[in-house]
Amino acid sequence: RYKYACQVFDEAKTKVATTAANEDKAACFSDAPVEKYYDASIDNRFYHIDKADWLKKLNEISAAFKAEPELLGGEASLTYQVSRVYIVNTEGTEVVQNRICGRIMLSTQAVAADGMSLPLNKDYLAYDLDSLPTVEKMVTDAKDMVKRVLALRNAPVADPYTGPAMLSGEASGVFFHEIFGHRLEGHRLKEGGETFKKMVGELVLPKEFQVYCDPTLRHYAGTDLNGYYKYDDEGVKARRVNNVVNGVLKSFLMSRVPLDGFPESNGHGRTSDDKDPVSRQSNLIVETNKPYTEAQMRQMLRAEAKKQGKEYGYYFKTVTSGYTYTGEGGSLNSFNVTPLEVYRIFADGRPDQLVRGVDLIGTPLSMFSHISAAGKNASVFTGVCGAESGWVPVTAVSPTIFVTQIETQRRAKSNYVPATLKAPGFGRKPSTNVFEGTDANNIDKSILYGMKDEMKREMDSLTIAGSPRPFYMSYLATRFKTINVKAELGGLTYCYDMPWDMLGSTQVLVGSFKRNSELKLGQYVQTGIQAGGGYDAIRRAFWTYSDLAYKYNLNSYAQKMNALNSNPLPAAIEKIPDMQRMAPVTVIQPSYDYNIDAQKLSDLACKASETFKDFKDLTNTSVSFEGAYEDTYRVTSENVNLKEPHSYLKIKVSANLRLADGSLQKNGFEMNFTTPEEVPSAEILQAKVREFAEQFVALKDVPILSDTYKGPVMFEDMAAVYPFTENLLTLNKLYAKVILAPNDKALGKKIGKKILDPRIDIVNYTSLPEYKGTKLMGAYSIDADGIKPEAEIPLVEKGILKQILNRATPTEHAMHSTGSARFTNNPRAVALTTSVGTFHVKATGTTDADKMKKELIKLGKKKKLEYVYKITSPAGAESLQLYQINVKTGEEKLARITQAILPTLSQLEKITAISSKENVYNLSKDVNTSVICPSAIILDNIELSSNTPRSEKAPAIPYPLQR
């Protein structure tokens, strides 16, 4: 941050010297009083809520949306926040303040016949959960939302309009927030957004109007206010700011960036996350000294409409959000508010008419000049506001207002077409019992039956006149839980223990098995699924996304066929179908235990990370845990029905080291497990962290290799694995790549030819559970396409390539699946990939492991070299370590190069020596895999060289452990 500040300061000085002077002559930063404030520690009871009870309540509330199956969705959610913020600065301010807040959001959405999306929302905010409305009240509100959104769906679309309007308290609150509140934010008045800067002391609103921002208000009009705080994010005490008094502009919202005439902060410097504070709104309150009844304001509107020759005026009842441009950076000084419910109020007294598709637009001064009157009762709009300093909680409070002239535009037309099929109803029972008698539990059954029944309906009925029907469908769903823990120097940085969630993917193909609509392999549509929603929720999720996927694939199929008609494939490629047919299969694998003890993992991470306190040269040190358990389900239209549980838990250790030459090096290692139960003890993990730290620190004063070296090099441990995995386990190598063109770079072209040293065999084990006492994470019994693979798949024999691995997607060099489709480990991207299970590099004609170094030295002597080199990498390490070995004495010492280049595949055709010892490694990247490989190999004619390292200036302030 100091370096960044210096850079910005230099840029500011240059800007002052090279650009026209700014009209505002105020300083860049203002003084502020020293504050001392300490909120009492948060009682433990606030950190825990009865999740089961709240889930029951939310289910009861959201069930009200089931009254109308055609709604796209209906949700009730609770966000509960407990935070404790610490603010200190060099001036002596020390502020500690708490925020405990609960917010329930109700949301539903319909789609009109023309594709227009029609969302409707309602929220409740309270600083005490017991103060939230009763469930009965929220159910009533949800039912009312259903009626309103259905009415909105059938409402006519409004055309662009100018004329009089009324804005409800909620709508006018958002209106004032967007067009006025943002233009009161002081930092915007420095340059660009200066709409009201020179209007201080002038009438900007009717003289009856008062506008102020007051972050000290916790309640207003019987409602808790979201913009409440005691101190802002610069440690300045919050205070009320009277922006408009009797219609006259008096003041702006100030952070510690001053303006001419406003030299100090008034407690509105706000931010979120790691962004710099700027002046932001808090609780914006609009009041009037001369309130009118709604009937009086309606009469005003009708009279004004007649005066302007308009048939009607508008009443804006609810809005969802808005945005504004304040003129900064050359932007247009304008605003756009997005109403949800808008009514025409007819001048002749006819009943109001609901319309949709209205956007309220304009420029602030013009709009303000037409504000005429305000009502009696205030409404509260709760929200969060996004700007350059992040998202901050805000509130806008206003009565209904009457405006003599507004402007609207017609909302941009959506390309979305309503679903072809009607939504599946609620409360139906599965139409089949195919999963009875399997290992499926009740949760499995609700998911699988939901997927299967909706797929049958879609396959039977999904069609658009004149377009091809789907010939193939595949649904993926994963039910998962995750854990993420990080600790630094013995302190917990974060712990995210996320409960069960769900996500899916939908594939709907048109065309045929010979030529389908995929433009790329795995053309799925990510599918949001309500966690815990059961059979009905599963069906509705796949109904929505099947329709989207079908329409997308109709377009991609037309695009693909047009391209192929214009550019016919070569005969050898044309005969290859896009897909392989699958035989029906049902395999439901039982779930297994994955017990997350977040406290235990947090304690373990803290203990292990504390080890770094003994290594003052290492910075940015951390120990973290990352894991997920997933039950992944797949159902296809070929009657492939699968459930596969899979999981991982990864320990990551990382650190930075500033080397003697000024360059900064990052390093780390990881350990991979299937479940938390396999994690080693604190003592073992601490020992591994210490070993890593000692090896890393030893690099600090190691010089860079000055001369280019070309000769024999021994690759040891993981460094002996990388030449094989990096050269072979990628698409177009041992993994077949789908491409609708001749593929000259495909490794498959070399089937039957030499690619490795004749002493090397490579076998892919699929179901092998362990090897010489080590558990293999790569073991699997059936692949993600439902194919049972061979237990051993020979890939290379005596250096000759025998075959490559593939899924159910024929390619030029792999026409059939080898059972190598795997579900990926990322629960946020449910997909399939091609992968090995256990990759075994076997060798004959090996050398005893303890003689490998002698072989290396012998080769060096033969070449009359003074030194030879060894590259090693401990299990899971991120970087490689280089050792220089004296040919005469055998002495080893650390060396360093700036770029480590692994051997190419062609260099592996002749390996000088291969260790008889084998190492076993478990890896967890896209999928869980295992590797069995010789512990070392020696290759000749390897080139090692270095570039000049990039030196970085040391921090101006020493790392705390180095002081």
Predicted features along the sequence, with ranges:
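Short aromatic-centered micro-motifs
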Residues: 243, 344-345, 508, 795, ...
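C-terminal, non-catalytic macromolecule-binding modules
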Residues: 248-303, 800-857
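Short, small/polar residue-rich loop motifs at catalytic or cofactor-binding pockets
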Residues: 235-238, 337-340, 787-790, 877-879
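Long hydrophobic segments that form regular secondary structure
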Residues: 236, 307, 787-788, 798, ...
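Short linear motifs in exposed loops
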Residues: 98, 253, 354-356, 645, ...
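Active-site bordering "gate/hinge" segments
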Residues: 1-231, 236, 240, 245-248, ...
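Hydrophobic alpha-helical bundle architecture
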Residues: 287-366, 383-386, 842-905
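Glycine-rich phosphate/pyrophosphate-binding beta-alpha loops
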Residues: 182-186, 255-270, 340, 358-364, ...
